A protein has these predicted regions:
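Predominantly extracellular/luminal regions of secreted and cell-surface proteins
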Residues: 551, 661-684, 806-846
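Catalytic core of carbohydrate-active enzymes
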Residues: 423-424, 444-449, 468, 474-482, ...
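A low-complexity, Ser/Thr/Gly/Pro-enriched, surface-exposed linker/loop concept
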Residues: 65-79, 83, 99-143, 184-187
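Catalytic and substrate-binding clefts that recognize carbohydrates or anionic sugar/phosphate headgroups
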Residues: 90, 129, 135-309, 318-322, ...
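Short, well-ordered beta-strand segments enriched in hydrophobic/aromatic residues
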Residues: 88, 98, 108, 145-154, ...
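Aromatic, loop-rich ligand-recognition surfaces of beta-strand-rich domains
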Residues: 806-809, 835, 842-909, 915-962
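Secretory targeting and sorting signals
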Residues: 3, 26-63
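Substrate-binding cleft of carbohydrate-active enzyme catalytic domains
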Residues: 264, 272-440
């Protein structure tokens, strides 16, 4: 039986305990933007939006505007100070307040009627604003008033009232209004100058690319969950100019990052918190100082979760009542047993995730049985939270997933629903909050995991999930996730590829019971242990690796909890001065913490192109081969069992022994996996992983410092500090193991100056209490060192060893397509479905260029497309992605490629050949040639099926040419 296409519950209790309407929202076709905005305003209870804002000159400054007209504050008529609050009065009756909360943080509040009584967000979005005394001053500079702090100079222009912000030097601009903030009906808009190379990030969990320059982003709940939609919007963004802003509102809006940048919300007020800093990381720190730091999840929450309905016999259940092994809630225990029998790491279940599923009483028996197998239990809010005190306090459930009616139309309703779920856990146990939600907002990072909603198990969905989950971190959302292989459809191949990279994010989950096809005979189970080989073993490999990396990933989430900097990081966070890292050329990869670079494979191909390695040394995790960045790595061999994974030079990565769930065995030996290069360090964070005792100081830290040659031969020294701090369960002492990735065997290894014995084999090393062994065949060289248990500080030194030599990367790179334009296509389908030629380079593999086919007599082959690259490039490679919609017509077979400075004379082709008749991505190496124009000529159709040509994406590699 097909269920509604969005997993939602029937009528249930709202956050206040009242019953709400039955919520069985079905997946809808895309709706025009105007209709979406009207719908968003309706559910928010706001007035319909007025017309688009007119130029400021359309109405006299400060004049009372008729309904629907555009108004501004007018000219400044007064300026007063009370403490660190500066009030500006304008000629039209409006007032503005600048409230300096810290030298780098201030609030700008504009009230059109001068009352400052309308504050719908209250302290929900900005719970912490008192940072103590702030040294501020002001002066009258003639044309403007100047408010200064130790970090900023805020200018209040007098005629008309406009604002701008500069650094403390009063010359370096941070942001500047290009015209007065205006309001039209129920909509208020701010206009900012856009810098020549200014880039923008943020806006919450946006399903697509994270670099936003040139994009218009709705800040509105839409519950549609396709590319470029909003799973959890946030009225926050930050800029490479060194600032971020959070609009203090529940109203939907839209941010256009063009020139000028226009920032609109559907309310007749302007209220914003500004955060400044010398880096994106410092801006995130300031933003989360005010809106709340990301919560600290329990360790089991980092493990794989599994959601499904195991109570199919419930008459209210809207799914298949005959699902095998899913009749009553205790059936979930059998699945837990399957996981352990398959030696598969996993940490929690949601056994009631399905319309009308409910659970079989007594719940405690099931919770206890799962706990005995190392699983925690969470519950979907299909029955509301009316019983959460008993479910948490008596039965022992520890997680909540909110959905549909519980989050209603989003905004404050959803925010309060999540907060009530948090209270339900923390007021009835000593456990930490662990809540999953959609429709988050600014501030949700302190309470919940946000996930991408109901998505599909396709290569295309996987492609945009990478920047979506990565980009969420640019709004302080440390825990952003998506169902592994989606909720609908999927295949063993897409499942395994999706699981690989999501294992390097803090939180991830499977959702079973909804797939059109599935790996287990029609029951659509998406647990990793339900697959056949080779998928079973590959899934296990990456889940086991995540468990081993738990101390590293957990520490990175502690960093997020302290600083707002997420553990899943866009490349720009680690490399803000690298122009390549600032934009979407790197949106298909990310940093897991500060040391691991993950480049997911998101197509049905064993080859990964376009991996960008920034400045520094990068080591292939699997082979040990080292590369010298910056540069692009193409042709990386990535069969199904290989995720492209690179380790930064100098990395110090703590690792647990292998286990299938937290607490399965004691961490009697802690491994530090080290890629020595120069000077580096790591500060390990540990606590009990379960309770809230860490909030009162129950945790420990251990610092590790490494010195090594930057290149060549020398001594590698590892200094391990004594753990500081305490928590329940902290080991009194423990052994340590070090895996040093070096190229040659050492002359000596010492522990605090005393020689450590070298051992002749890995087997001898494994059985010894201490010693060292060098294996040149292990990932191009690994030095294994084992030390006895201790609670104190110690130093290990390996003399006479060498760090691996790093291979240079090619100088060519993917050519930015943002300036490309269509010059000519001999044929394109415009009368029927997707087919416009410009779609061959729109960055969306789901669209395509297709030559005309709806006419009675389609044009014959050959076909061609000509593209203006926007500038001259030395082109050395072409990428061709055939259509990805399941169709086969038009795949290019025989081809020729031309590059020229003019479309009047192409000269001879720089490449020719024949592409295979498959949907996989294709590449063609070109004889390097400089030019501004590309011509791709399709000579034949790969399958000989007809006179057509099609292309999902055309890409090029090369470098700028003079």
């Amino acid at each position: 039986m097909r269920l509604p296409s969005i997993r939602r519950s029937q009528g249930r209790q709202g956050p206040s305990g009242s019953r709400v309407h039955a919520a069985r929202r079905r997946r809808r076709r895309r709706t025009p933007a105007v209709a979406l905005l009207a719908a968003a305003l309706t559910v928010a209870g706001l007035a319909a939006a007025g017309p688009v804002a007119l130029p400021a000159s359309a109405a006299p400054a400060g004049a009372a505007a008729p309904a629907g007209a555009t108004a501004t504050a007018g000219d400044v008529t007064g300026f007063t100070r009370s403490g660190n609050t500066f009030t500006v009065t304008a000629s039209g009756g409006a007032k503005a307040r600048v409230v300096v909360a810290r030298a780098d943080i201030f609030r700008l509040w504009l009230s059109p009627d001068g009352s400052f009584t309308d504050d719908p967000a209250g302290t929900d979005l900005a719970p912490t604003t008192d940072f103590g005394p702030v040294a501020t001053s002001w002066s009258d500079a003639g044309a403007y008033y100047r408010i200064t702090t130790g970090s900023l100079s805020i200018r209040v222009n007098k005629r008309p009232l406009q604002f701008s912000v500069f650094r403390a030097d009063d010359t370096t601009p941070v942001w500047q209004e290009t015209r007065p903030t205006s309001w039209t009906g129920g909509r208020t808009t701010q206009y900012l100058a856009r810098g020549a190379d200014e880039q923008f990030y943020g806006t919450g969990l946006r399903l697509g690319e994270w670099a936003l320059r040139g994009k218009t982003v709705p800040i509105a709940v839409d519950n549609k969950w396709r590319e470029n939609d909003n799973a959890s919007p946030a009225p926050f963004y930050m800029s490479t100019n060194g600032y971020g802003v959070m609009r203090n509102t529940w109203a939907p809006g839209s941010y256009g990052f063009d020139a000028p940048t226009t920032l609109t919300h559907d309310e007749k007020r302007f209220d914003a918190w500004y955060f400044t800093g010398d880096s994106l990381k410092s801006v995130l720190d300031a933003y989360t100082d005010v809106s709340g730091k990301p919560f600290m999840a329990p360790m089991w929450g980092f493990e794989l979760g599994n959601a499904d309905c195991f109570n199919a016999s419930n008459p209210d259940y809207q799914g298949d009542h005959n699902r095998l092994r899913h009749q009553t809630t205790p059936d979930v225990v059998g699945y837990a047993a399957d996981a352990r029998a398959a030696d598969m790491p996993s940490g929690w279940f949601l056994p009631n995730d399905g319309y009308g599923c409910g659970y079989t009483a007594p719940l405690k028996a099931t919770v206890d049985a799962l706990k005995a197998k190392g699983f925690q239990t969470g519950l979907w809010t299909s029955t509301g939270l009316g019983s959460i005190a008993d479910e948490v306090g008596t039965a022992g459930s520890r997680g909540v997933k909110t959905d549909v009616a519980w989050i209603g139309s989003g905004y404050k309703y959803a925010f309060d629903g999540v907060r009530q779920a948090v209270d339900g856990i923390e007021k009835n146990s000593d456990a930490r909050r662990f809540v999953w939600t959609v429709d988050g907002w600014a501030g949700t990072q302190r309470n919940a995991v946000v996930w991408t909603g109901d998505t599909y198990g396709t290569w295309d969905d996987m492609r945009w999930h990478v920047p979506a989950i990565t980009g969420a971190g640019l709004s302080g959302l440390n825990y952003a996730a998506g169902d592994i292989d989606g909720i609908f459809g999927g295949s063993p191949q897409t499942y395994t590829r999706d699981l690989q990279w999501k294992a390097f994010t803090p939180a991830f989950m499977t959702m079973s019971g909804w797939g059109a096809t599935g790996p287990s005979a029609g029951y659509h189970d998406k647990q990793p242990w339900r697959f056949a080989e080779p998928y079973l073993s590959i899934n296990r490999k990456y889940l086991q690796l995540k468990m081993r990396l738990m101390p590293y990933l957990y520490t990175m989430s502690r960093v997020a909890h302290e600083s707002g900097v997420p553990s899943t990081r866009a490349m720009v966070l680690e490399y803000p001065d690298d122009p390549v890292a600032r934009g979407n050329l790197t949106s298909g990869q990310f940093m897991a913490g500060d040391s691991l670079l993950v480049a997911p494979v998101v197509s049905d191909s064993p080859v990964r192109d376009g991996i960008y390695l920034p400045a520094g040394t990068w080591t292939d995790y699997w082979t040990g081969r080292a590369y010298a960045g910056p540069g692009w790595l193409n042709g990386y061999q990535a069969p199904l069992d290989t995720l492209p994974l690179f380790v930064k030079g100098g990395a110090v990565v703590p690792m647990w022994p292998q286990m299938n769930h937290t607490g399965e065995k004691p961490v009697s030996t802690l491994t530090y996996d080290i890629h020595p290069r120069g000077t580096s360090s790591f500060s390990l964070y540990e606590d009990d992983g379960r309770t809230r005792a860490y909030r009162t100081g129950a945790y420990a830290r251990q610092r590790v410092d490494v010195t090594a040659p930057a290149a060549g031969t020398g001594t590698v020294t590892v200094s391990v500090g004594a753990p500081t701090g305490d928590y329940t369960g902290k080991p009194a002492s423990r052994g340590h193991e070090f895996t040093l990735h070096v190229a040659t065997a050492p002359a000596t290894v010492t522990l605090d100056g005393t020689p450590v014995p070298g051992l002749a084999s890995k087997a001898a090393y494994d059985s010894a209490a201490s010693g060292w062994y060098f294996d040149p065949a292990d990932r191009s060289g690994v030095l294994w060192i084992k030390t006895p248990g201790t609670a104190g500080a110690f130093t290990v030194a390996a003399t006479g060893t060498s760090v691996p030599a790093a291979a240079a990367l090619p100088s060519s790179a993917p050519i930015d397509r943002s300036a490309w334009s269509l010059v000519h296509a001999d044929s394109q389908e415009t009368a029927a479905e997707n087919g416009a030629a410009a779609r061959a380079f729109d960055g969306n593999p789901a669209t395509l260029w297709h030559t005309a086919w709806s006419s009675a007599k389609p044009a014959p082959l050959p076909h061609e497309i000509q593209i203006d690259l926007g500038a001259r490039y030395a082109v050395d490679g072409l990428g061709y992605l055939p259509r990805q919609d399941g169709g086969v017509n038009g795949r290019i077979g025989g081809y020729e490629v031309y590059v020229s400075d003019t479309t009047a004379d192409w000269g001879p082709p720089v490449a020719s050949g024949t592409f295979a008749d498959t949907a996989a991505a294709k590449t063609a190496a070109l004889a390097p040639k400089s030019g501004r124009y590309l011509r791709l000529k399709a000579l034949t159709e790969a399958g000989g099926r007809g006179p057509w040509t099609s292309a999902a994406e055309i890409t090029l590699t090369g470098r700028p040419a003079s």
